[in-house]
Amino acid sequence: MNIVEIAKNLIKCQSLSPYDAGCNKIIIKCLHNMGFYVEKMKFGKTENIWAYKGTGYTLLFAGHTDVVHAGNVKNWKYPPFSSKLKDGILYGRGSADMKGALAAMLIAAKKFFKSYKEPKGRLAFLITSDEEGSGSNGTKKVINVLLKRKEKIDCCLIGEPTGEKNIGDIVKNGRRGSLSVKIIIYGKQNHVAYAENNNNPIYHSNKIIGELLKTSWNDVQCILPKTTMQIIGIRSNIKKFTNITPSKVEIIINFRFNFKSNKKIIKEKIVSILKKYKYFYDIKCILHSDPFFTKTGNLLKSVIESVKIYQKITPCIINSGGTSDGRFIYKISKQIIELGLLNKTIHKDNEHIKVKDLLILCNIYQYILKKILIKN
């Protein structure tokens, strides 16, 4: 199969997270045909692939087969899983995020091993069907298995869609950490007609939120963007009635933080605000990921060089955006770069990619393989 055929076949699989829906069969067949050792790791409903070929210095290609829901299919030009190719544009859910990049990786590997029978290093693949969802049974668990085996991964290229206007104009070498916080403010349930006696936790929560919004969490940008806070939800324990006040209110918050913050620092700031108002409260913090950052190394140099050659531009290193599976891979590899297709239609109606972009990305990946596994 050529790169377009692989991409089309992957897009046709309705792999809503965490279901693989047949993507792995396509990928495994391609890998076996190249002589890769392939191991399937299934955790719960999630299907993962760990595969490699060669020995020594290891470059990992990482990605995911799962996709988000297509939404209202009436808003699509073509059915979201029909994999429609029209005028050089390939439509379909997951085309940009990130089945197109997976096809580019596979063809880049095929061309590389056709040219170099015995490279100096090892190429590995880690593919999961649980990246868009919770991520609990995906890359995270595979990495834990690899750590127990004492596997070594020297550098990792993740095919997340990073491009804004052109392939390679943006690459990422780090991400902020993610922390979710639930604050529970307690009051006293009462009849709404007796407002003067109300200990209403909604009013208490308003004061707390006001303080949170005024708080400086971290004004230092350092090597990653500033720490930010977003309030995700406010809900009371009253669901149906309209004549009673609630006894508690939950405030749900998410923080994206850089190396100048951490779970302990953020929690201490919140607690100091809660103590100031002397309300009864509980606070629960869930750390989803710590920040990570790749310093200059052979992978970043190779990525920049390849983009300059094939795109005639110098990529910008911008580490904004959400989390990626790099948060798990960082435990085993300190060189992680994200480089993929354009992100302007990801998770949207009519997600699509240009075939010419697929070919460019494949050439870039192939050049990186040569630089890392031949000239390293």
UniProtKB/Swiss-Prot annotation:
Q: Name one GO biological process term.
A: diaminopimelate biosynthetic process
Residues the record marks as active site:
D66, E131 (proton acceptor)
Q: Which reaction does it catalyse?
A: N-succinyl-(2S,6S)-2,6-diaminopimelate + H2O = (2S,6S)-2,6-diaminopimelate + succinate
Secreted as UniProt keyword: no
Extract the SUPFAM superfamilies matched here. Answer: Bacterial exopeptidase dimerisation domain, Zn-dependent exopeptidases
Broad EC category: hydrolase
UniProt GO MF annotations: acetylornithine deacetylase activity; cobalt ion binding; succinyl-diaminopimelate desuccinylase activity; zinc ion binding
Instruction: Report the pathway entry.
Output: Amino-acid biosynthesis; L-lysine biosynthesis via DAP pathway; LL-2,6-diaminopimelate from (S)-tetrahydrodipicolinate (succinylase route): step 3/3
Enzyme Commission number: 3.5.1.18
Disulfide cysteine pairs (residue numbers) = none
Enumerate the cofactors the protein uses: Zn(2+); Co(2+)
Q: Where does Zn(2+) 1 bind?
A: H64, D97, E160
Q: Which is one Pfam family of this protein?
A: Peptidase_M20
Q: Where does Zn(2+) 2 bind?
A: D97, E132, H347
| Entry superkingdom | Bacteria
Q: How does the cofactor attach, per the note?
A: Binds 2 Zn(2+) or Co(2+) ions per subunit.
For this UniProt record, the keywords arranged alphabetically read as follows: Amino-acid biosynthesis, Cobalt, Diaminopimelate biosynthesis, Hydrolase, Lysine biosynthesis, Metal-binding, Zinc
Under InterPro entries, the record lists:
ArgE/DapE_CS, Bact_exopeptidase_dim_dom, DapE_proteobac, Peptidase_M20, Peptidase_M20_dimer, Peptidase_M20A
Give the protein family.
Answer: Belongs to the peptidase M20A family. DapE subfamily.
Role according to the record: Catalyzes the hydrolysis of N-succinyl-L,L-diaminopimelic acid (SDAP), forming succinate and LL-2,6-diaminopimelate (DAP), an intermediate involved in the bacterial biosynthesis of lysine and meso-diaminopimelic acid, an essential component of bacterial cell walls.
Record text on subunit structure and interactions:
Homodimer.
In its UniProt entry, what is this protein called? Succinyl-diaminopimelate desuccinylase
Recorded source organism is Wigglesworthia glossinidia brevipalpis
User: What gene is behind this protein?
Assistant: dapE
